[in-house]
Amino acid sequence: MEDSEGTDGTDEDGCRAGGWFHVEAIITHGQSQVSSDEDEDETETREDLDFIDNRVPGDGQEVPLQLYAQQIAQDDEATVQALKRKFVASPLSACSCIENDLSPRLDAISLNRKSEKAKRRLFETEPPDSGYGNTQMVVGTPEEVTGEDNSQGGRPVDVREEERQGGDGEADLTVHTPQSGTDAAGSVLTLLKSSNLKATLLSKFKELYGVGYYELVRQFKSSRTACADWVVCAFRVYYAVAEGIKQLIQPHTQYAHIQIQTSSWGMVVFMLLRYNCAKNRDTVSKNMSMLLNIPEKHMLIEPPKLRSTPAALYWYKTSMGNGSEVYGETPEWIVRQTLIGHSMEDEQFKLSVMVQYAYDHDITDESALAFEYAQLADVDANAAAFLNSNCQAKYLKDAVTMCRHYKRAEREQMSMSQWITFRGSKISEEGDWKPIVKFLRHQGVEFVSFLAAFKSFLKGVPKKNCIVFYGPADTGKSYFCMSLLQFLGGAVISYANSSSHFWLQPLADSKIGLLDDATAQCWTYIDTYLRNLLDGNPFSIDRKHKTLLQIKCPPLMITTNINPLEEDRWKYLRSRVTLFKFTNPFPFASPGEPLYPINNANWKCFFQRSWSRLDLNSPEDQEDNGNTGEPFRCVPGDVARTV
């Protein structure tokens, strides 16, 4: 059959044309023939009159026209459906495309299909918008949009509108690859798509400033550690914000050293900041993210190296150039390591100064002394020299050992009245002696008899050196004894450690002792081995890694639920102990609040009130006997030499 003249309107071409047919009529005629369109002089015939629809509405011919319109609509819908079936990807193809977007390398080594759940894309190739208004962008990988005709394979390009709140300024560190097929930006895209974003930022920093970031800072593993000085490097900052940060940062800081560089990523802001108060990394990150209008992941934030001379010289030299903006007073750690006068002021560590500090603050624990003394490095030259030393552990141990020797010698030289005065001088609060007396009366203890026994107890009279408080549980025996022990700075021994040879060693370094909650087995042990201890006579104590020590037992208090006088097996202890019975439950004014509070201030007032009745020496008598009252000093004084 001979082909029809005009355009070949196949279904495929029709679909490509969007569902419309453009048919050209080719008419051949001789030169002598004239077409009806060209014959302008010919008069109109009756057939031409039907071209104009001049029928009267309502004559019954509307139904065929509506039917014809419906047929045309059905044909158009069928054409659209054919287009959809041709270009919409199949489920398998769509899943593979999603997995390819997630990780092309991972998809290349995959042996089977992965999960069909939609996942977040790791690598986006959309160009970052300006942040203002609605932005229409084309989403698709470079492989999907290659070619001149979008209908030639691949997935369709998804055109969408992204509504963004203008002015957020958040720009991603990804670069849109041009679709020209060139590899000019391929290396940059590969670098930015690396999984370790921090390594990428560190590499860019060294490229811009010529020095490693970690050569200027020290690392804080915890983001909750507070520090006043911070080094901040922010990437991809807008130009206007980078220029305005010089003014925006001033209300928050005392000192700022700001350097601004231009790179392929945009503006890079490098700052050394000293805040008005100490802040942690999380707080600094949120503050800088708000001021610079960038996400927190685009910043490197660490504290500076305070004892590194090269780092201090870097900040000092860059502050003198025209590429830095500096305001505020230079931090002392930079001044100390860069100026000659301050460098010569560094002195050697003196152990005696550290020992004096431990003695004055009553620190006999190595950990506590190390923590407290290290905090003085900014204001004390000897503490700074201690931190700069490589023998901190040795100095610390020696200082605590010497402090204990001084404290022990001072305690042994004091009488009980001097010791009570010394302990009372450490308490500045004013108390009341009445709660102690009321508590003893509440337990049925006669106050006069208690004072008489307490007087002999403090003097260490033989056979009167031990006081026992016994009675039912929850009567306040331990509460009463612990409060007195805390005021006098005594020691506690426990029968649970009786299997050790050294369980009595704490009594050698105290003026008073306490054995809490003695059981029947404990009383049997005391009756067997510790009769001489209850007498108040000298006895021998075994100390760890030291020779035996012969001392007089300090006054000892014992709390128990058993009356040792009622047991015949302990009859030899009856003359060695003084008993007071607590019978009534401990009174409370409210839950957790005792009715009769007994604290250090109340014990101080109690001893001042009953000083003469306890036959204690007055402070005036102590000064007359040679006690000058001057504080102990182990640091040699400076001698003024005349020229």
From Swiss-Prot:
Here the segments flagged for biased composition (Basic and acidic residues) are: 157-167
Per its UniProt record, what Pfam families does this chain match? PPV_E1_C (PF00519), PPV_E1_DBD (PF20450), PPV_E1_N (PF00524)
Where is the protein found, in the record's own terms? Host nucleus
Alphabetical UniProt keywords: ATP-binding, DNA replication, DNA-binding, Early protein, Helicase, Host nucleus, Hydrolase, Isomerase, Isopeptide bond, Nucleotide-binding, Phosphoprotein, Ubl conjugation
Locate the region Disordered.
28-60, 119-179
Q: Which residues bind ATP?
A: 471-478
This chain belongs to which protein, by name?
Answer: Replication protein E1
User: Which organism does this sequence originate in?
Assistant: Human papillomavirus 57
